[in-house]
């Protein structure tokens, strides 16, 4: 039972860990879609992820935004109303989060019932060719460079130029006419060179040149057409503007993951850069810094800038495995040729719930090994005992007698002559002045009491007292008392 519970917990942990990662496709996708002209179609983007991904749609490499009036980006996918022939092409849903991105691809085919009705009277082969009663081969028109026609929505600034191509072939050789907003263009607007009639050149664009340009290619067998949408925009006259409330102050757990967002509105695609303020005293950690508003900042790596349907641009800064040094002020900087704007936010990183173990203080000995606990006091006692023993042995050595020979002077019979006087260093228990006074008192007691009193008064100094009595030639008797001192 315990083993099964452990395996169950391990599986739950593994599932929770695996949930965080790049976006993934959550449902089956039918990549080839078809729709009839004038109808409505919805292309789904069934992706999921943790954290939830951001999605954007592209058609033939061009980002779909709010200017595409018949296109609407929903939470579930892309909705196209009143489908036109030029809506055919390749669509991509790109989903991205902080761990990566994934794409969902579609190929949209637009079915034109009216064209098929016109051609229904003509016996066609599978490739648009047929043979008449005389045996001649005929072929309806077809575009020979479809790869150069994928980009159907084109934006250009005022004063620039653009070329719209509709190169086609057929048998008999087809003709081509150009229309703007369903009105034929004049010959001088197209050009008289037949070799260039398949390409429409628009030079020195003006705002009034915006519109839908259609090429109609036809022969006796059939007809094809293609439409381009041209947007002529005024050159930018203002610096970028940061919209919304982002970036906002954020708090993250130690080791966790968080992000800052930055939404910038600009007439042209701006440069979005993230900066982090360099805290005082940490300048040496960075190779280069920049000054913004009188403060030093370091430039951070920046990911892809996304174009949003509302015409704004979005960028995200991901912070993974947050540490204490990640805390501080962050700046989102949006710039174009006219200037820049920025906005700041602060990141707070909560303390590590499991900080590294601190060094054990000297007062705490519970975590020290037992050999150390026993060895240190034992070593100290051994050293102290050795020093104490050495001092005791040193103090037991006898003091050297004075170098000069004792001088014998005649003394009265009742006086005591002290032949040896201890050194000051040998008298450790009394001071020298007390010793002299006691010595005089000792001698005044007479020879009979002196030895006994001396041994009582100085038990550690007087170790041997003896008396010598001898007579000289002159008949005088001298008595000497010898006292042996020992420290």
From Swiss-Prot:
Region (Disordered) residue spans: 115-147
Gene Ontology cellular component annotations, sorted alphabetically: plasma membrane
Ranges facing Cytoplasmic side: 393-487
Glycan attachment residues as annotated in the record: 105, 225, 249, 287
Chief subcellular location: membrane
Transmembrane segments: 372-392
Molecular function via GO: fibroblast growth factor binding; fibroblast growth factor receptor activity; heparin binding
PROSITE patterns: IG_LIKE
A biological-process GO annotation: negative regulation of cell population proliferation
Membrane topology term: Single-pass type I membrane protein
InterPro entries linked: FGFRL, Ig-like_dom, Ig-like_dom_sf, Ig-like_fold, Ig_I-set, Ig_sub, Ig_sub2
Residue ranges, compositional bias (Polar residues): 115-125
Signal peptide: 1-18
Topological region Extracellular: 19-371
Compartments where located: Cell membrane
Domain Ig-like C2-type: 23-109, 141-231, 240-348
Disulfide bonds: 45-93, 166-215, 262-332
Tissue specificity comment: Expressed in cartilaginous structures.
Top-level taxonomic group: Eukaryota
Record Pfam families: I-set (PF07679), Ig_3 (PF13927)
Keywords: Cell membrane, Disulfide bond, Glycoprotein, Heparin-binding, Immunoglobulin domain, Membrane, Receptor, Repeat, Signal, Transmembrane, Transmembrane helix
PANTHER family per record: FIBROBLAST GROWTH FACTOR RECEPTOR, FIBROBLAST GROWTH FACTOR RECEPTOR-LIKE 1
Role summary: Has a negative effect on cell proliferation.
Subunit structure and binding partners: Interacts with heparin and FGF2.
Protein name, as recorded: Fibroblast growth factor receptor-like 1
Species of the source: Gallus gallus (Chicken)
